[in-house]
Amino acid sequence: MLHKKTIEDLLDIKEIYMEPEVLSYQRAREILEKYAGAKLIEVPSHWKIPELHGFAGSVEDWISNKKNILVLGIKKSLQARPNTRSSHFVAPSESNGCTMSCSYCYVPRRKGYANPITIFVNIEQICNYLRRHAARQGVLPAEDHIDDKYWVYEIGENGDCSADAGICDNVRDLVNLFKNDISNAKLTFATKFVNRELLTYDPQLKTRIRFSLMPQKMSKLVDVRTTPISDRIDVMNDFVAAGYEVNVNFSPVIYYNGWLEDWELLIDELNEKLNEKTKQQLVAEIIFLTHNEQLHEVNMAWHPKAEEVLWRPEIQEIKYSETGGRNVRYKRGFKKDRVDELVELVYKRMPYCRIRYAF
């Protein structure tokens, strides 16, 4: 279930759903030229595509939808939402959805079922909004756990920017925006896909890329269509050399027999492969698994093997999300002990690595 190394192995666009207004945007015209052979299907809204969103029958075409379908839309609500963990703000998304199919992903919970990539073509409006928003913030008043100098904007909450960058220049435009036009802030995103084209972007330390990592054995089961873990680790030194700040996102942490021993192996690989420059700037984020009852039921139709480790009622409890969704997480006391174990392991085996947060 692990793909090859290029975006072409992930995407073979045969159909493009698009809002009619997108044709007035240069970014849309560039994408349509790139995928000139695709069938074009006009839709009133990128949110209202019945055969893709909220349609239970689409579970049978889960992977093919993500590989063969692209949606072009216009981001209408531009707002930067406050955050307190990986960033100070969550920026307006340049995309929504993903070509990868991680079985635990929260994005399909919000939009429904396969949720292939939607590219928002009004990137100039998004950039202009961010330019104004950052200007209003002034200088970061004090060093905090997020950054010691800059306001940080998350740009990839609803997708994987490394994959998006294989479709169009939205991500490049945002990297250039923060590098050239926004002096008091940087951007960040997490990724499970190695796109070496990003090494040409010259971010000048104004982009923090967070490589999502977990033990390879578990990744093979649940990280469907993503870059193998060792390949992600292999490029971390290259990204630091190319001017990125490189962090790691230990997420999601999944409990199973032998889980901590597998994390030791992953940490050993990091210690062996990372050079001193990468180690000295490394920060980790640790996030334990949260799952969802509806997504569990969908997964049972296309990837039931993963649910054997993701859906563990005997050690999980109900958690209601801010939007009212019925989610599950590890039981409070059980989870605290596991978090403490992993944090202790990281501090012991990776003394150079600060932990931004763990929960």
Model-derived segments and their meaning:
Residues 1-28, 271-359:
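Auxiliary Fe-S-binding modules of radical SAM enzymes
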Residues 155-163, 194-197, 207-226, 252-257, ...:
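Conserved radical SAM core fold
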Residues 93-110:
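Local cysteine-cluster metal-coordination motifs and their immediate loop/turn environment
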Residues 71-84, 107-210:
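Conserved Radical SAM active-site core
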Residues 1-88:
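Flexible, acidic/Gly-rich N-terminal and inter-domain linker regions that tether
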Residues 102-105, 211, 248-251:
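Conserved, mostly hydrophobic/aromatic
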